[in-house]
From Swiss-Prot:
Name the UniProt record assigns to this protein: MTOR-associated protein MEAK7
Domain of life: Eukaryota
Keywords assigned: Cytoplasm, Lipoprotein, Lysosome, Membrane, Myristate
Induction statement: Addition of nutrients and insulin induces its expression (at protein level).
Length: 456
């Protein structure tokens, strides 16, 4: 197998396998024979040809960025500026660097997609590139109908989650003096090749998003792109109409933090919109159901939550392990992992008089990093300055917050035990939920009306 030199010449060695290079060559032939570009040599293609091929699959500004990046590739080292059109060598080298290259090669292409001049670029230019890249991912997945059940962009105008995720990706960039790009005061700083290369190396989403944009935008080498662990399948039982707190960008960000074997599917266990504002319903739907993601939106529109690495159980002890984490989605995206200070990862309890009743993650009794009270709709996020378990700041707008929207999603494939529990009534599967319902004075209206399970 190995690398291919197919029709590329001696000055550049493509990193594509022969069958991949054949696809690249076929696309170049289609682009260079575009009938709407009569004045272009058959050995090159124009911006118009690329625009005609892509159509509406990518935003126009990303098509232009990709084209400019290609025509700025100088394989001889003698070019005095960008070429007028894109040659086959330039096209193959660009695709090879962007799809198969190492951090150095990818950073070279990113610099060329940002600026026509050699040398450092401003941080604000990198910010605009990153926002264009993130926005293009949502655009192309929506256009190709590959959102897997999640929403992309609903309201007209700029998508605020695009800017939030772009800011998160940029927050891991280290400037020359070691400072991080954490605010507008750094936007006039210079970013040289070393800064961009280090950023691409440490932030995998940059390379992944470039691959999505090119493979899905150009419809090239799609078999080499596995979207199943990038965008998990969204499952909501019985086809019920349901608008999640999360959009596809939020899900992609959280999903990337999960263990790999749990990234391909999210199944809705509980939604306050569908199941009501009830702590007993919450307990009944989420206990003994395996790893899951809980997310809520407070009255001030802050969106945050946590990942529980194992099944929730109602008991007075802390549970979970160091794979658990807390996260924020709005107003900023961030993940907060365990510190090793204590093992207070997860807590779920009710019906007790001397210890707290509710769902908590991190911190300690009455001082949780995230707390949902048994009086459903109330909670707290206490961190002065940070949560001891996860090093998270206050996640909610107010320390003591109120919320209307909460969701819990099971991630990955359920075990046979979890499937068996899922086929039973909530009250059969979780006697604790039944007890809580009775304690709260609610009768079981469905008692006597349900079908009897096979094992009874």
């Amino acid at each position: 197998m190995g690398n291919s030199r197919s029709r590329v010449g001696r000055s550049f060695c493509s990193q594509f396998l022969p069958e991949e290079q054949a696809e690249i060559d076929q696309l170049f032939d289609a682009l260079s024979s575009d009938k709407n570009s009569p004045n272009v040599s058959s050995k090159s293609f124009s911006l118009k040809a690329l625009q005609n091929h892509v159509g509406e699959a990518l935003p126009p500004e990303m098509v232009t960025r990709l084209y400019d990046g290609m025509r700025r590739v100088d394989l001889t080292g003698k070019a005095k500026g960008p070429s007028e059109n894109v040659s086959q060598e330039q096209f193959t080298a660009s695709m090879s660097h962007l799809l198969k290259g190492n951090s150095e090669e990818k950073s070279l292409m990113i610099m060329k997609m940002i600026s026509a001049t050699e040398g450092p670029v401003k941080a604000r230019e990198v910010q605009k590139f990153t926002e264009d890249l993130v926005g293009s991912v949502v655009h192309v997945l929506s256009h190709r109908q590959e959102l897997r059940g999640w929403t992309g962009k609903e309201a007209p105008g700029p998508n605020p989650r695009v800017q939030v995720l772009a800011a998160q990706l940029l927050s891991d960039m280290k400037l020359q003096d070691g400072k991080r790009l954490l605010g507008p005061q750094w936007l006039d700083y210079d970013c040289d090749r070393a800064v961009i290369e280090d950023w691409v190396f440490r932030v995998p989403h940059v390379a992944i998003f470039l691959s999505v944009v090119i493979c899905k935008g150009f419809l090239i080498l799609c078999s080499s792109l596995d979207l199943t662990t990038l965008v998990p399948e969204r499952q909501v039982d019985q086809g019920r109409g349901f608008e999640s707190i999360l959009d596809v960008l939020s899900v992609m960000y959280i999903n990337a933090q999960l263990p790999r074997e749990q990234r391909h599917r999210w199944c809705l266990l509980f939604s306050s919109e569908l199941h009501g504002h009830s702590f007993s319903q919450l307990c009944g739907h989420i206990t003994h159901r395996g790893p899951c993601v809980a997310v809520l939106e407070d009255h001030d529109k802050h969106v945050f939550g946590g990942f529980a690495s194992c099944s929730w159980e109602v008991k007075p002890q802390f549970q979970g392990d160091n794979r658990c984490f807390l996260f924020s989605i709005c107003p900023s995206m961030a993940v907060y992992t365990h510190t090793g200070y204590n093992d207070h990862y997860m807590y779920l309890n009710h019906g007790q008089q001397t210890i707290p009743n509710g769902l908590g993650m991190g911190g300690q009794h009455n001082y949780f990093g995230l707390w949902v009270d048994v009086d459903f709709g109330k909670g707290h996020s206490r961190a002065k300055p940070t949560c001891t378990t996860y090093n998270s700041p206050q996640l909610s707008a107010q320390e003591n917050f109120q919320f209307d929207k909460m969701e819990v999603w099971a991630v990955g494939d359920p075990s046979e035990e979890q499937l068996a529990k899922g086929n039973k009534s909530i009250l059969d599967a979780d006697p604790e939920a039944q007890a809580l319902l009775e304690i709260s004075g609610h009768s079981r209206h469905s008692e006597g009306l349900r079908e009897v399970p096979d094992d009874e």
